[in-house]
Every structure is written in structure tokens, then in C-alpha cells.
Amino acid sequence: MSNKQFHLERKHNVELKSDIINNIDIQSLKRKITVPNESNYAAMEFVLHSTPSVVSAASTSSDVEGPTKNKQFRIDTTQFKQSSVQDGGSRAAEITNKILFMLTKDNMAFEAIEKEGFKLFIKSVAPLYKLPSRETIINLMEEKYKALSTIIKAELSSVEYLSLTTDIWEDRLNFRLYFGVTSHYIFNNQHKSVTIGVTELTERQSAKYFETWLLDVTNEWKIRKENIVVVVSNAGSHIQKAIKDAFGNDKYLACFGNSLNLIPSKVIELPVIKSISNKIRTIFTYFKRSTTAADKLKTSIDLKLIQYFSSQWISTYNMLQMFIDLSDVIKEILLQCRTAPTMITASELETVKESVNLLKPFLDAIKTISAEPYLMASKAIPVVNTLKTSLNALQPKTEIGSKMKKLLLEQFREGFNFIENEIILSISTVLDPRFKNIHFKNDLAYFKTIGNISRALYTRELHKRPIQNNSTSTNIKNDFWSYHRELVNTIKIQDTVHSNDNEMYYLVQPPIDINSCPIQFWNSDNTVLGKLGRKYLSAVATSFPGERIFSKPGRIILESRCRLSTQHLRQLFFLESLSSEDWQL
């Protein structure tokens, strides 16, 4: 056997039949073997070990194929892939870009790339990739900021309408205050929220200082004043004045979410509620410190007791709700432990239950507006109307419960009694095809809103509103918007509009489904009303999206990041607010 035959049988898994070598047509085979000097060898017939038959010279039209081994890469292809992963290659740049995205989006310290575990992980998935240093990552972050900020500036300069939200937050590690602003706009039929400015408050917090800074930020990001629909803030009077002086009195709006949060926050400060909450907190603390009590609780139910933070009413609510759910188990365990604190009385437990029932509508409302990436201004009035209806439907049985309900209604009237007179909120609600005018309770405020819309449309005719059937059921279900659906089903049209009135004819049409997209509704409308609808549906009512970025301690400024400059913080806030699509990943 020649060396070549030995090589073919050993390396290429074939048998050679030399008696029919000269009869084979190698072009008819599906599997070919290329040898170093093919001209020196005759065509040969191949028999695959896994194939029972011999492929003969007569099988020129046969489609018989044998199993193939994994194809080996060409040397030049392998070298190209290796070089792309190495420093300066396309694959290396892709990996670096994704690492930078991870560090900024997940609020990781830049030192993470120098940790032993991360280095081992990268070595296992990309052995030829060289991790950049911390200094290189910071430089790349600056370059990424320049590139992506240019793109966002182009978007902001091209959009018709946008909203701004502001927030002040504290860096507790370094005892510093920061002021930030976030832009909210619709681009390619998608809502976007981008942090465009962060500054350290090094000067006296005067209205003039904030006004100048806000104007500088909007100018830097190519935002025109006439394109700003609303500026939302939950800050003090000096911020309000700065916004009004910079953009106009009609464009300032107090944060709806913050106003809503203040109502239950004041109620839980009632002495009787605070006293019972402290007793429950003492019980929860005992279970955390006592191994015996904790083990007994664990054998009964696999849950951990949660305590509350005095500054957060939702935390108090969750603690009270958990205590109600576990009260029977907790009572039995406390009776078995000598050093256990005293269980609350039956009347106190009833007070806790009524407190939870009264606060639940507010929790549902907060969850509704917080679950979305942003809250349209058009939802504020419907949320208030639905929440008030839910609250009125509750009938407390105890004296303390009745007192709580009275206080909640008083605080509610104080905060939202004139919400329908807010021009931005009222126009946004009417122009939202899901709500229109069915949630208005103040006829004067409604007709004033129609007048504002009519003047914007250059029309003099005012149209009457649909009236509601007063027999609306007050059976409030678990769904927050169940009351809204009842209103939709019970409205009556008082007057009609002539069919050729294409613009105001919209008002007498039934509302669309609550889960429908109002922006898509107006996108296909090229009338003046459609343009007005797109304008006011771009408005937001709360600074919650900005607070998700600014107000959570430790999200951006970690102990390992506390030495970052204000410029780098501004870049981090901006990059964190962008999506993976914006990063072009």
C-alpha cells in the first residue's frame, strides 16, 4: 500500500478498490477529495465505511451521499476570526461595546473589569480577547457619549413636541446635591425618555440659577422652546419660578405622582395608626432577632416578615397587609414564647384591616402610573376620578376607619379639587380617544377646555358634551379601570354634530378600548385636530421616570464610583437612560 493510499484510508475514512480505479468518474461524486498534486493520480472509486454499497463508475447520476465529518475551517478564515477578536479587531470592538453597555446600564463600577471572576469569565468565552483597563473604559465612555449624544440631539431637534421633567437628589456618600432633567418624546412611534442634564448644586439654589441652567441644557440639546409642551417638577417654589420664567407660566405642571403620594403619607401619620404600626414593627423585629420564633414561623409558612421605612407609606402598607395575612400564625407563636412582645388587640387588628382597605385604592393607582415607563398627562384626571369613586364606595365600620376616610377625602379635595382646571391635563384628557370627556365632573371646566381646543383649531363653535347616566354602578372590581369601563357603557350623547364637521365630530364618537394606543389613533389623522392630539399626548404628568434614575440611592454613585466627576456622572446618566437599540447592539 502506498503512502497516499494509507493516508486516505486513515485520515479520510475511505476504502480504495484498485481494480476499478480507471472506471470512476470523480465528477459524479458528491464527496470529493483534493490531494496536493491531483494531476499525478488517477481517479479512484471510493467506498465509505458507513455505506454498504460501492459507488461504481456507472452511478454518474446517483445522488448517494455519505455522512460527512465536521468541516474544517480554512487557515485564512481561522486567522481572520482570531485577528477580529484580538485588540483592534471588529469582534473585539463588539465585545468592548457590550461590556461598556453592561457597566453603564447595570450601574456597575468600572473596576469590575479588573476583578478576577470577570477576567476568568471573559477568558473562557473569548480567550484571545484582551480586556481594556479602567482608564480605557472611561475614555471609551466619553467617546460613546459624544457619538450617541449627537444622534439624540438630532432626534430632539426633529421631533415636534416633547416634555421635560426635573428632580433634585442627594449623594449621601459625598453630601452633595444634584439637579437633573429628563426629556420625554415620541420618535418612530415609540416613547423615549433620555436624561439630558445633571449638575451639582454648588451655588445658592436661586430661581435665576436654575433658569439659566435649564436654558443652557435645552440649547445644548437643540430643543426649541415652542416644542416643549410641559415641564414637570416636584421641587420647591424656586424651581417652579425658574421653569415659568424660562418656558412660560402655562408650561409648568406639578408632579401628579408626588401629589398623589402625599395623601396616604399624611394619613399613616395619625397617632393611632402610628402607634399600632410601631407595635407591629416591634413584633416583626422580635421574629428577626429570636431564632426560636423565626424557626417556628418558618415551619408554619415559608415567608420572611418585612419591616417598614417610616418615610414610605407603601412600605407601611405592605407590612400591615402581611401582618393581616399571618396574624393567626403570629398569635400562636407569640403565645409559645415567654419573652415575646404583646400581640395587638382584636380592635387594633380591625383598625389595621380597615386602614389597609382604605389605602388599597391609592396603592392600585400608584401601581397603575408606576408600571408604565411614563404617565401620559391624559391619564391624570381619569385616575383621580376613578380613585375618588373607589374611596367613596368604601364603608368603614369603626370610628377610626371613618376618621381615616374623612381625612383621605379632605386631603384628596385639597390636592385635586381643581385638577380639571389644569389646561394641559384637561386638553390632554379630551384629546385622548380612550377617555375624551367621560371623566369630567365640572361642566364649567369642561366647556372651558372645549373653548381652548376650539381656539386652537380656529373654530368658533362650541359643542355640547355627552352626558352620563346617573345610575352608574359603584361596584368597584379588582381592575383599576373597571369604573372607567362602566362609564363608557353608560354615556349618552346629548347633541350630535353635523357629519361634515370632521374635527369636532371626534367628540361624539364612543371612546376606544382602554388598552388601545392613543398615539396610533392620531398618527393616521392629518387634520389640525390630529396634530393637536399628537401634541398633547406627548405630555407627561409625573416625574416618576426621572426619579427612577435620580432618586434611588446608590444606583449611579456607588462607593467605588464616588470619585467620579460631575461630567462623568452626566455621561453615565445619559448612557444609562438609553436602550440597547440606541446603543446599536
Regions found by a protein language model. Give the residues of each.
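C-terminal recognition-helix end and immediately following basic linker
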Residues: 1-27
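Extended, C-terminal/distal alpha-helical "rod" segments
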Residues: 197-202, 229, 301, 330-502, ...
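Short, basic alpha-helical nucleic acid-contact segments in DNA-binding proteins
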Residues: 8-18, 33-36, 142-151, 155, ...
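Generic recognition of stable, solvent-exposed alpha-helical segments in well-folded globular domains
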Residues: 94, 113, 117, 136, ...
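Amphipathic alpha-helical/coiled-coil segments positioned at domain termini
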Residues: 124-125, 177, 303-329, 347, ...
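Intrinsically disordered, low-complexity regulatory regions of eukaryotic transcription factors
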Residues: 17-108, 112-113
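Active-site neighborhood segments
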Residues: 104-106, 110-304, 309, 412, ...
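Mobile genetic element proteins and their domesticated derivatives, centered on retroelements
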Residues: 4, 118, 133, 167, ...
